[in-house]
């Protein structure tokens, strides 16, 4: 009987903690889209100053524009 109560209490605590932390995720996703907008207006000097993670993001963005799947979303 105690083990069932403990399991129920554990599940409720996980659900409550998940509910209270979901507000943090949409802001982090918005930052990713802002980064894509920042990559739109690059010139050569900006390209030389990029961090490696920015270059990966730029490469992913270029591949997305070249892919056939992207044309389906237009």
Curated annotation (Swiss-Prot):
The keyword Signal applies. The keyword Secreted applies. GO terms for biological process: defense response to bacterium. GO terms for cellular component: extracellular region. Residues 1-24 form the signal peptide. Keywords: Antibiotic, Antimicrobial, Secreted, Signal. It is found in: Secreted. Expressed by the venom gland. May be an antimicrobial peptide. Belongs to the non-disulfide-bridged peptide (NDBP) superfamily. Long chain multifunctional peptide (group 2) family. This is Anionic peptide clone 7.
